[in-house]
UniProtKB/Swiss-Prot annotation:
Taxonomic classification: Bacteria, Pseudomonadati, Pseudomonadota, Gammaproteobacteria, Cellvibrionales
Protein name: High frequency lysogenization protein HflD homolog
Any one Gene Ontology cellular component term annotated for this protein: plasma membrane
Organism encoding this protein: Teredinibacter turnerae (strain ATCC 39867 / T7901)
Main location class: cytoplasm
Subcellular localization(s) per the UniProt record: Cytoplasm; Cell inner membrane
Length: 207
């Protein structure tokens, strides 16, 4: 993976897109099907040709690019607090996951079965969502650190919503892997926001 601000911005857009959908789903119960399908496809795309190919092209991460632009312009906005927390949580979990080759092996094998399910049922089918959520529960959820999702209890207690949230968090961690491969570090978020903003704005003009 080529290290560049462009690829870092694409990966961050993937993370923020998933994080924003988690926030919206947890608080309103509303799921954007196209955003969710992009997340699922990123999990089963094992041989992408580029950073944007992970998500199916720049158009697929346009919502994430817009959210990322808003955050980079005003990262202290209370409205972005949960989104930032989920993004940072995905970064933490990705780093821990990268150290566990045994867990990565299990995830890889089980995602192959998800890929076969997607071919038969599509990305949003209950069987697919449940399977992805189970992988997350059986592997990443076992780590001591967990992402605490806040929202409306009536939505969070619904099994389908909980499974969708786990699937989206899983995809955010996948995007965090891409972010690391592109050269992303947490220092960038603190000291290089102007460079990331410029790259994000250029990508939005093309998406």
């Amino acid at each position: 993976m080529q290290k560049s601000w462009r690829n870092i911005a694409i990966a961050l857009a993937g993370m923020t897109q998933c994080a924003r959908q988690v926030e919206e789903l947890a608080k309103t119960g509303y799921l954007k099907t196209e955003v969710f399908e992009t997340a699922v496809k990123s999990l089963i795309n094992t041989d992408p040709s580029s950073a944007e190919d992970v998500f199916g092209g720049l158009d697929a991460v346009q919502p994430g690019l817009s959210t990322l632009k808003d955050i980079l312009e005003d990262h202290r906005s209370p409205g972005n607090a949960d989104i930032l927390r989920y993004v940072l949580g995905a970064v933490v979990l990705q780093k821990r996951l990268a150290r566990r080759k045994d867990v990565l092996y299990i995830i890889g094998n089980r995602l192959e079965k998800v890929s076969q399910q997607v071919e038969h049922f599509g990305c949003s089918h209950d069987n697919v969502v449940s399977n992805i959520a189970d992988i997350y529960t059986d592997t990443i959820s076992k780590f001591p650190y967990r992402i605490q999702v806040t929202g409306e209890f009536n939505y969070l207690q619904q099994e389908r919503v909980a499974a969708q949230i786990r699937s989206l968090l899983f995809a955010a961690i996948r995007a965090a892997t891409l972010w690391r491969q592109a050269g992303g570090t947490r220092w960038h978020m603190l000291f290089y926001r102007s460079k990331m903003l410029a790259a994000t704005e250029q990508l939005l003009q093309r998406a």
